[in-house]
Amino acid sequence: MDFFENAYQQIPPWDIGRPQREFVELAGSGAITGDVLDVGCGTGENALYLAGRGHRVWGIDAAPTAIEKAQEKAKERGIQVTFLIRNTLNLDQIDRVFDTVIDSGFFHTLSDEERPCFIRNLSGVIKSGGQYFMLCFSDREPGGYGPRRVTKEEIRDAFRDGWHINYIRAAVFENRTNPAGARAWLSSISKL
């Protein structure tokens, strides 16, 4: 069984039962616009929150149990979100483009070899001028527990061609393991 599918048999540490504060603040500031794709959406808290604010939202995740839980939440809350089981590296299987793509903890799961494939496919599902907002673990997070840490330089290198990095700023990745959250980077990246 896949690591993530197995994790969703219980409540994984990153599933906090509400949207990540960073995405709530982005939405409140008006930074998230139009149709939204949530890559690696898990049980859908960020997607459901944005749909509740009036966005048309699609959420994709490779873990069937996560998508099943997201669909149950949408039904219980009476919120319309299209949740799909998809390999997030194969975004080219989605036949539409989005104004905004959000990523709450997906990028930091990618290997160095997977990153170019993801970014190439991401480019195909986001409109020119569209925004990609990524929340990932920072190299400033101490210890070895949890996902891979990502440096600012890795983000800059990965999005060097065809993208403009608006900012990479210190943020918090909320989780159930550490009440203070984990040190993270929040990046705003525009497709050229």
PLM features per residue range, with description:
Residues 102:
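A conserved beta-strand element that flanks and buttresses the S-adenosyl-L-methionine
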Residues 105-109:
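Short catalytic micro-motifs in class I SAM-dependent methyltransferases
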Residues 1-37, 43-96, 110-125, 130-192:
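Class I (Rossmann-like) S-adenosyl-L-methionine-dependent methyltransferase catalytic domain
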Residues 99:
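Conserved acidic residues
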